[in-house]
């Protein structure tokens, strides 16, 4: 199975406890490593980081924004993230998309609708309901 993991707002392979790196980063990193024992896993972030490939696990940074940028300010980069994702990968080759955090979920839902690829969404927090977010983007 070919699995696409989207972690738009933070790199799961950057230092935990710094910037937006925390529990979600650990979760995405660990689940991706374990899934890669039997599947091809591609993890993509918009945060600037060093990309790598390790057997069945590939990590791709689209290098859109600095790690120090506040998560509330990353929303404006969603369309650029989706565009670069479509330019960088043949998305039709993925069997499933797992989106982490609500920002990644917005992109995964669009791709899923366009290419009829099933997607899983894990919220990891209720941050979307905090002040400062553009809730008009969310359509269930």
Identify the residue ranges that each predicted region occupies.
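N-terminal subdomain of nucleotide-sugar transferases
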Residues: 1-52
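Active-site proximal beta-strand in glycosyltransferases
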Residues: 3-4, 112-132
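A short, flexible beta-alpha/helix-coil linker loop
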Residues: 9-14, 65-69, 128
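Short acidic, glycine/proline-rich loop/turn micro-motifs
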Residues: 14-18, 70-72, 131-136
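Conserved nucleotide-sugar phosphate-binding/catalytic loop shared by glycosyltransferases and other
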Residues: 53-71
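Short N-terminal targeting/anchoring amphipathic segment
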Residues: 89-104, 108, 118-120
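Conserved small/polar residues in nucleotide/adenosyl-binding loops
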Residues: 138-140
